[in-house]
Amino acid sequence: MCAQDITMMLGNIAQIDAYKQVYASLGQKCKVHLAVDTGMGRYGFSWDKLGEEIATFAETVEITGTYSHFNNAEKMAHLQLNRFKQALETLKKIGANPGMTHMSNSAAFMTLGDGGLDAVRIGSAFLGKCARGAGDDRLSGWL
């Protein structure tokens, strides 16, 4: 992966120990996309503890991006987006560049757009489908 210049996902401290072993032996920094848990509870550094966790290893990685996932694009979207933006501010305060930022999937993109971030991760919308339910024709004409 090092030779191919692959960016790794990083969502917990255990991963960084493994990355450090490999990349330090090569004299390289591991390129990572930081995962931030803003409420989904599946994967990522907790949004409210991000600063203290990242500070322990920030100098050993190159952050190329920071992302999160919406638990529910409608019910908690604004709360999660605000948490994510707070996490991004925390990174900046400790001198870490968050890189490319992204959070919206297809359903979130339909309601929030890009959320003021750098990118979106549409999947089903790219194919002209919408996970929001049958009869939603807002995607017709996209393809």
Regions found by a protein language model. Give the residues of each.
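Catalytic beta/alpha-barrel core
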Residues: 2-16, 68
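Active-site loop/helix belt of alpha/beta enzymes
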Residues: 20-26, 31, 36-143
